[in-house]
Amino acid sequence: MAKSNPNKQSVELNRTSLYWGLLLIFVLAVLFSSYIFN
């Protein structure tokens, strides 16, 4: 039981960092397109 807990936490952390990366790319794309079209 104690062995599967850190594994699950690592997967959850990886998924969270992936979502943050996608959010960061989305924000940068919006700022970049607004900079271009201005």
Curated annotation (Swiss-Prot):
Keywords annotated in UniProt: Chloroplast, Membrane, Photosynthesis, Photosystem II, Plastid, Reaction center, Thylakoid, Transmembrane, Transmembrane helix
Membrane association type: Single-pass membrane protein
Gene Ontology CC annotations of this record: chloroplast thylakoid membrane; photosystem II reaction center
TM regions (residue ranges): 17-37
Gene Ontology BP annotations: photosynthesis
Keyword Transmembrane: yes
Chief place of localization: plastid
Pfam families the record matches: PsbL
Intracellular or extracellular location(s): Plastid, Chloroplast thylakoid membrane
Family that this chain belongs to: Belongs to the PsbL family.
Quaternary data: PSII is composed of 1 copy each of membrane proteins PsbA, PsbB, PsbC, PsbD, PsbE, PsbF, PsbH, PsbI, PsbJ, PsbK, PsbL, PsbM, PsbT, PsbX, PsbY, PsbZ, Psb30/Ycf12, at least 3 peripheral proteins of the oxygen-evolving complex and a large number of cofactors. It forms dimeric complexes.
NCBIfam families noted in UniProt: PRK00753.1 (NF001972)
Described function: One of the components of the core complex of photosystem II (PSII). PSII is a light-driven water:plastoquinone oxidoreductase that uses light energy to abstract electrons from H(2)O, generating O(2) and a proton gradient subsequently used for ATP formation. It consists of a core antenna complex that captures photons, and an electron transfer chain that converts photonic excitation into a charge separation. This subunit is found at the monomer-monomer interface and is required for correct PSII assembly and/or dimerization.
Listed name of the protein: Photosystem II reaction center protein L
